[in-house]
Amino acid sequence: MTNKLDCLKLINFIEKSNLFTTNKIRDKKLLIAFSGGQDSSCLLTIFYILSKKWGFKLGAVYCNHCWTDSPQSSLSAFDTLQMFDIPFYFVESPNSEPMKPEQKARDWRYSSFYTISKWEDYDFVLTGHSLSDCVETVLFNLFRGSGLKGICSLKEDQKFSNLKTNDFFFQKTVCFLDPFFYFSDKKGNPFFRKYRLFQSMSFLSIFPKFDFFAFGENCAIDKSNFPLKNKSKGKNLQFLTSFDIKNWFGIKKICRFCFLDKIGQTGIKKKRGTNRVPILIFSRRVNKTTSPLALNFQTKNKRVDRKSFLFRFSLAFALPLAFALRAKGEKVRKNALLNQIKPVSFFFKTKKDKTETNLFHRYLQTIKKLQNRDKISSFITIFRPFILTLGNVKIKGKKIKNKNLPFQIKKLIRKKEKEKGILWNSLSKLDNKDKLISNQIQKKGFKLIPKFILTKDKKSFSNFPPFIFDQLEKTFRKEKVDTKPRNSSPQFEVLFNKLSQPSSDKKNVDFIVFRPLIKITRETLFLFSNNLKIPIYYDKSNKDLNITRNYIRKVLVPLLKKINPRVEENIYKFSKIIEFYYQVFGDLKCPSDRFDIFNP
């Protein structure tokens, strides 16, 4: 294989796949399974470039199996994901223990994908399986004595219907409703109004570019770390969270969140029948002027109590809940309230080593301590990009857009953005055709609908435009009398029942996984990543030849390539032939006498 590769040609090849030609990807949310390796990094880069043209939304998920004590793989994945302005999810294995064997790790991984997809409303999950992975799976199953089903195991798209959400992800976390914050001061500082706060079953998070927050429960707090004033009034004590924020405008601020059960200093009264609790924020600029911002948050029949905790992870500080004094009905001045708080750093010490002072490294240490102390089964953390860095928002007169991406990737993004106008013009023409067809159906009446359906093949029925489905279903519902036509064929009855069924809830829809790179070899992806200078982490465990898959990848496949350099493509084509026969005839059982072998 030559060292030159046309990266745009490879991206266009992906764009010709069934996922794009059937227009399934338009206005969808895609979750990419990211491991930090070569295949998943190329997959993320390709779809990030194509998202600028097609307009779909991306997210990435990284699962930490804790197979090694070194956090290097997680750190490299975190550094790579920071380059892209997309939300990404970090999943820690239960109790931070190694997830073994391989089948158990796979089940846990796919169950995590399904859980996140269900929470965050993702339509598809994309994995980075390549043609080389398909070949290795075929050889692996052949060596184990598999039948037709094992040879054609890796498909371009696959449905999982028996997966269940991992309840242990959110058993011990506070569940908040969305949206979480309601800004009451519209004339307040624009920095806080630019924050977006997100809800999930496991974590509530505020996310600038490199900062995040997480709420949880059942965390013991050492009261000795939080000195209290006026202990005689301890009955009226309330919790107050305290942390520092570095404004991306270059202004340092000190923020205070007061969790109060009753009327706070803002004067906002709690309405009957609601679960809103007042929160106070005090901000201090460099010039020592203060301006309060009043916020409300809505809970789901829960209150923040002594067992709850708030984490804030940043490049400088991470502070726990602190106790603050507030007497009932007493008006406490802002400066006096600020002076009462003595925050204590609780989970890291600054070290000279760069990896030790890294934000994500400290986060990993904290998660392990929490799980060892509180026996939390598993943790999911959501990282979202700071809203000011999205689009063409001007900060200090400069545009922040794809700032950390390599130049080669930016160049391909600009090319795809130019194709965006042509794409939407063509799609609008298709929509107009769909509208014309549906209008003709409605004008000619219901009797012509069976003819229109029956002219389509049974296989192409599922590829019908969604707009037509909506129009047909509306037409069926308009018929108040017996909607089933007389002398209808059995084929039409099946289609009719399928159309007349109510739309199923999204929670019960099958979990769909796509493998867009299944027709591309690992060598081609290696050239693609080199040309675009994509950062890749090479896992040392892949060199262990005691693992069967590594032995096939490192020893057997290179030997077969010496016989025929295109052996991977031939094995892949062979598996597709077997897959075709399996779909037509099913899993054929061979007579036992065909397997008679002489054993000396």
UniProtKB/Swiss-Prot annotation:
It catalyses: cytidine(34) in tRNA(Ile2) + L-lysine + ATP = lysidine(34) in tRNA(Ile2) + AMP + diphosphate + H(+). InterPro entries: Rossmann-like_a/b/a_fold, TilS/TtcA_N, tRNA_Ile_lys_synt, tRNA_Ile_lys_synt_N. It is found in: Plastid, Chloroplast. One of its GO terms (molecular function) is tRNA(Ile)-lysidine synthase activity. One of its GO terms (biological process) is tRNA modification. It is an enzyme of class 6 (ligase). Keywords: ATP-binding, Chloroplast, Ligase, Nucleotide-binding, Plastid, tRNA processing. SUPFAM superfamilies: Adenine nucleotide alpha hydrolases-like. Its EC number is 6.3.4.19. GO terms for cellular component: chloroplast. ATP binds at residues 35-40. The keyword ATP-binding applies. The keyword Coiled coil does not apply. The N-terminal region contains the highly conserved SGGXDS motif, predicted to be a P-loop motif involved in ATP binding. Ligates lysine onto the cytidine present at position 34 of the AUA codon-specific tRNA(Ile) that contains the anticodon CAU, in an ATP-dependent manner. Cytidine is converted to lysidine, thus changing the amino acid specificity of the tRNA from methionine to isoleucine. Belongs to the tRNA(Ile)-lysidine synthase family. This is tRNA(Ile)-lysidine synthase, chloroplastic. It comes from Tupiella akineta. The gene is tilS.
